[in-house]
Curated annotation (Swiss-Prot):
The gene is nadA. It catalyses: iminosuccinate + dihydroxyacetone phosphate = quinolinate + phosphate + 2 H2O + H(+). It comes from Ehrlichia chaffeensis (strain ATCC CRL-10679 / Arkansas). Its cofactor is [4Fe-4S] cluster. Iminosuccinate binds at residues 27, 44, 115-117, 132, 201-203, 218. This is Quinolinate synthase. Binds 1 [4Fe-4S] cluster per subunit. GO terms for cellular component: cytosol. GO terms for molecular function: 4 iron, 4 sulfur cluster binding; metal ion binding; quinolinate synthetase A activity. Catalyzes the condensation of iminoaspartate with dihydroxyacetone phosphate to form quinolinate.
Length: 314
């Protein structure tokens, strides 16, 4: 795309957003050009809170499908647009509603805590939703005598088991990017940059987390890199967050770890689903008023209860 085309697109996007009283929300894993034009950038919890309080008539969600669903569940009367409806999530896809219902029926006396990376139907059959930044706080509020079902991320679940000293029943889902980081590449990078701190998202498997100096959600990783006096960081999460890290820590250097050849994002750390959203698609969805998120009212109402529980307990 030519520079002039980008400038024109940005101007048109701003004009259309203002004309339709739309707010543009973007996740940290979006391309930098989308992050820069968004009205608000954040992690899943921050974006959920922003969606719950916005006065805009239209919410344009630059993220993946389940995130746009959350915005619609919280604001059923508002129009919620997603630039590309094919922007899915490997974690959400790993946990279909029918299988999850059967899973719950096998453990009727358990409290179901479900990661926000899940579809609306799964949220509807859950007790509480959590994000990576709120999960530990929520789990610690569950009585010790209650068994917890945690879905769908088994690596986040295993990390939380250690943090809270609570044994949970885990659904076997994973993120195709976080599970694919190469341990060999990480070790090589740590040798080459021996003063660098390793920052990791808890969706990474345990054999990678053991090397981390700090583990946290995208917002927590961003804050740590900003507050810490160290100037070199090796980052184990989707590389979109680096754009914001460089903004808040302009004097620091950030290194991206390659992924192995067995994952869904070969030799990179970009989520292929997140990157389906583009400036052109953002422009078109504002211009045309679609693709729009629509949900079954009953499912939406059921899912809202578990999301409200998250917002209250967070």
């Amino acid at each position: 795309m030519k520079e002039l085309d980008v400038i024109t697109l940005l101007q048109e996007i701003r004009h259309l957003a203002q004309e339709s009283n739309a707010v543009i929300l973007a996740h940290y894993y979006q391309d930098s050009e989308i992050q820069d034009i968004a009205d608000f950038i954040g992690d899943s919890l921050e974006l959920s809170r922003k969606a719950a309080t916005t006065t805009a008539d239209v919410i344009v969600f630059c993220g993946v499908y389940f995130m746009a669903e959350v915005a619609k569940i919280i604001n059923p009367a508002k129009k919620v647009l997603l630039p590309d409806l094919n922007a899915g999530c490997s974690l959400a896809d790993s946990c279909d509603a029918e299988s999850f219902k059967k899973f719950r029926e096998l453990h009727k006396d358990c409290v179901s805590i479900t990661y926000i990376n899940s579809l609306a139907e799964v949220k509807a059959y859950s007790d509480i939703i959590c994000t990576s930044s709120s999960a530990e706080k929520i789990i610690r509020q569950i009585p010790e005598e209650k068994q917890i079902l945690f879905a769908p991320d088994k690596f986040l679940g295993a990390f939380l088991e250690k943090k809270t000293n609570r044994k949970m029943i885990l659904w076997p889902g994973t993120c195709i990017v976080h599970e694919s980081f190469s341990e060999r590449e990480l070790i090589d990078m740590m040798v080459r940059h021996d003063k660098a701190y390793v920052l990791a998202h808890p969706e990474c498997p345990g054999h990678l987390l053991k090397y981390a100096h700090f583990i946290g959600s995208t917002t927590q990783l961003l804050k740590f890199s900003s507050d810490n006096p160290n100037s070199e960081f090796i980052v184990l999460t989707e590389e979109g967050i680096i754009h914001q890290m460089k903004k808040v820590s302009s004097g620091s250097t950030f290194y991206i770890v390659k992924t192995s050849d067995s994952g869904g994002c070969v030799s990179c750390s970009k989520c292929p689903h997140m990157r389906l959203n583009t400036l052109e698609k953002l422009y078109l969805c504002l211009k045309n008023g679609y693709p729009e998120i629509t949900l079954d009212p009953e499912i939406s109402s059921m899912a809202k209860r578990s999301l409200d529980a998250m917002l209250k307990m967070s």
